[in-house]
Amino acid sequence: MLKRGVYAASLSVLNKDLTLNVEATISHAENLIKNGLHGCFFFGSTGMSQLISKNEKMELISKISTHKQRKHFYLGTGCNSLNENIELIKYASEFNFNTILLMPSAYYVGNSDEGVFEFYKKIILACPKIKIVIYNFQKLSGYILSLIHISEPTRRRTI
């Protein structure tokens, strides 16, 4: 779980063919930690998560799972697909990444409260041991999360 501190999004370094350069991406994140951050997140919007394939994400997850800075590394999914989110979270959980940065699907404009809650609820039901860091990025997701919207479902652990 996250402790009090300064956390940042880590960028994704791409090769000339636009595939993920796993080693350079990890090296960048390692430098963030060495320069004083308490942790960093892979596969958020800064990490261009929407453009990184599931297989590339899985490769990075397996590599950082044994990295010496492992305890400072956290993951987002960066997926619009509910099923792909669940699959990637389950894969990350196999490597004990149980705190996941998760934003509502950013594909459709005008998400409803009900739709967003169902999205989170289905992920929690499929992956009950994870802790979710709710990623509230209105300009990307087209949705405004507020404390009022999430307090009761969070308390009941339905979201």
Per-segment meaning from a language model:
Residues 148-159:
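Single conserved hydrophobic/aromatic residue that forms the stacking wall/gate
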Residues 2-143:
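Active-site beta->alpha loop and helix N-cap motifs at the rims of alpha/beta catalytic domains
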